[in-house]
A protein has these predicted regions:
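ACP-dependent fatty acid/polyketide chain-elongation machinery
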Residues: 1-66, 88, 248-260, 356-371, ...
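Condensing-enzyme catalytic core mediating Claisen C-C bond formation in acyl metabolism
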Residues: 4-8, 31, 35-36, 218-294, ...
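Conserved beta-ketoacyl condensing-enzyme motif
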Residues: 7, 22, 28-164, 193-202, ...
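A glycine- and small-aliphatic-rich helix-loop capping segment at beta-alpha/alpha-beta transitions
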Residues: 21-28, 112-129, 179-182, 202-215, ...
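Active-site-proximal alpha-helical scaffold in enzymes
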Residues: 77-90, 142-145, 150-153, 159-194, ...
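Phosphate/pyrophosphate-binding loops at sites that engage ATP/ADP/AMP, CoA/4′-phosphopantetheine
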Residues: 84-99, 250-257, 286-303, 326-330
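Glycine-/small-residue-rich "gating" segment that lines the acyl/pantetheine channel
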Residues: 126-133, 174, 178, 195-252, ...
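Short glycine/threonine-rich loop-to-helix capping motif typified by GTGT followed
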Residues: 271-280, 309-326, 346-353, 383-386
Length: 417
């Protein structure tokens, strides 16, 4: 019998809400978490807004003496993971050893500890070696993030970080699904976390010309997916974590099942370091592969959570890809929305963010809206649920992601509630 994978716990640290209840209220009502940057002085640069997590106490999750040795992404991930385990009804450190050996940690992150590493270089080049962390190398490598979570929760299963750009957390959840399907693990702490709001990263994106520079005085209007006047994305941050569990295992312990992860597809266009190919064929094929594994057709898709970055190229081609994947007639019938309009772009964590929003949409039978879609683009002509959410029962949903380097990944969620 095929082993099925279900989500039994969820935790959130988001620019528009810390904790799942706060995130649910904000995302379903359409409240923006984009604000002026407070992490550093942005007054001298062209972009001064970000989807920044506010009212978050890092020292509630990392001791004061340890804070200089870790990145901001770690307290995000610890907070979201703790909530995910709690809502799943799991006291991880109290589990028997054999169960902890079958409990893995697989997290996606695009930048990991990049802001920590940037600070270490700043200290080094300013001759402040005494202020540098003794752990500048181990903390700075990508793989440290999953290890920190494994140590905190005493989980002895596979501990991996997946980093594939913006598809990182989608791919991490798929890898976790494969580990459970194959029988190697019974449950996995999985999802995504990123904290890329630093001067160096923001300046790098400015050099690429892919951030919006028009909305410093009205931050909440800056992320404008599918609107004709969109001119770039807004950097975001946060963590969205889940407990992924084998279905029979979850049933046996009486767990509440939030959704089934039933399909995954991933492709690469092999085209360009940053740009998408205009045809949209490979993003469409990734969606098709996910639907194929889930055993569903276009007529079964009730909602699509879009990548929707607010760049001219991405939004146009993602629209084209959905028409190819679902057929143009069906694509026009299926409601879709872009969470990045509310929170900005949290890089490798964005797939997990979209999955969290989709689960909440299933639970509440309420679609999250796409904000700031003020000017219709004739090349982006699908139903993006503009301005306000709407009631909708969701049986199956597609969660789509597109990354630098021509990567495309999609997951299908099934509502078992």
């Amino acid at each position: 019998m095929k082993r099925r994978c279900v989500i039994t716990g969820m935790g959130v640290v988001s620019p528009n809400g810390v904790g799942t209840p706060a995130f649910a209220d904000a995302s379903l009502e359409g409240r923006s978490g984009v604000r002026r940057i407070s992490r550093f002085d942005s007054s001298a640069i062209e972009v001064q807004i970000a989807g920044e997590v506010s009212d978050f106490d890092e020292l509630a999750w990392v001791e004061k003496k340890e804070r200089k040795h870790v990145s901001r992404v770690l307290p995000f991930a610890l907070c979201a993971s703790s909530e995910a385990l709690e809502t799943a009804g799991i006291q991880a450190t109290s589990l028997p050893l054999e169960e902890r050996r079958r409990f893995g940690v697989i997290i996606g992150s695009g930048g990991g500890s990049s802001e920590f590493t940037e600070e270490q270089y700043r200290l080094y080049f300013h001759g402040q070696l005494s202020k540098m962390s003794l752990f500048c190398v181990p903390t700075g490598v990508m793989g440290s993030l999953s290890s920190e979570l494994s140590v905190r929760f005493s989980l002895r299963g596979a501990s991996h970080v997946i980093t594939s750009g913006c598809t990182s957390s989608t791919d991490a959840m798929a890898y976790a699904m494969r580990q459970i399907e194959s029988g190697r693990l019974d449950w996995v702490l999985t999802g995504g976390a990123d904290a890329p709001i630093s001067l160096g990263t923001v300046k790098g994106f400015i050099l690429m010309g892919i951030l919006t520079e028009k909305w410093n005085q009205a931050p909440e209007k800056g992320s404008r997916p599918f609107s004709k006047d969109r001119d770039g994305f807004v950097v975001g941050e946060g963590a969205w974590m889940f407990v992924l569990e084998e279905y029979e295992h979850a049933k046996a312990r009486g767990a509440t099942i939030l959704a089934e992860v039933c399909g995954y597809g991933s492709t690469c266009e092999a085209y360009h370091r940053v740009k998408l190919k205009e045809c949209g064929e490979e993003p469409a094929r990734a969606i098709g592969l996910a639907m194929q594994q889930a055993g569903i057709g276009p007529e079964d898709v009730d909602y699509v959570n879009l990548h929707g970055t607010s760049t001219q190229l991405n939004d146009r081609i993602e629209t084209r890809a959905l028409k190819l994947a679902l057929g143009e007639e069906r694509a026009r019938q299926v409601p879709m929305s872009a969470l990045k309009s509310q929170i900005g772009h949290p890089q490798g964590a964005c797939g997990a963010a979209g999955i969290a929003a989709t689960i909440l949409a299933m639970q509440h039978q309420q679609l999250p809206p796409t904000l700031n879609l003020d000017n219709a683009d004739p090349e982006c002509d699908l139903d993006y649920v503009p301005a306000a959410g709407r009631k909708k029962t969701i049986g199956h949903a597609v969660c789509n992601c597109i990354a630098f380097g021509s990567k495309n990944s999609a997951l299908v969620l099934r509502n078992l509630m």
